[in-house]
């Protein structure tokens, strides 16, 4: 079985045990996390909603990310992904959430945020955790590694 499908299946098993639901807020993965989750039969029991907010305007409109953050720290930042997690939880009512924003490439990188830079955040209803990751490879490799890291982080939330 594909590692992404394996992680998503394990996530579903954990969420069913908690009788909990998850939501996703995605930028650079373009819905890839939600797609991986909904690949799992029965995911409608534990997947509440997915938000693909590729533009900054949609991050603000759909998830309530303060517009001022984009000018202060940029879309690929800890502050933005943490706001995305909180916004997705508020909009969906799901207990667990994951958010990602990154530079998948091949363009768009900078010295401070080179191609492969991704910020991820996870929320469990009371706490939000985030981390910056640097992935290697082409656009698809960065996106795939981001999906894996996002699902793995959700699994770790569910087992703490």
UniProtKB/Swiss-Prot annotation:
Sorted UniProt keywords: Hydrolase, Pyridine nucleotide biosynthesis
Catalytic activity: beta-nicotinamide D-ribonucleotide + H2O = nicotinate beta-D-ribonucleotide + NH4(+)
Domain of life: Bacteria
Protein's GO biological process: pyridine nucleotide biosynthetic process
InterPro entries (alphabetical): CinA-like_C, CinA_C
UniProt GO molecular function: nicotinamide-nucleotide amidase activity
Keyword Hydrolase in record: yes
UniProt EC number: 3.5.1.42
Subunit structure: Homodimer.
Described function: Has NMN aminohydrolase activity, not active on other substrates.
Family affiliation: Belongs to the CinA family. PncC subfamily.
Protein name, per record: Nicotinamide-nucleotide amidohydrolase PncC
Taxonomic classification: Bacteria, Pseudomonadati, Pseudomonadota, Gammaproteobacteria, Pseudomonadales
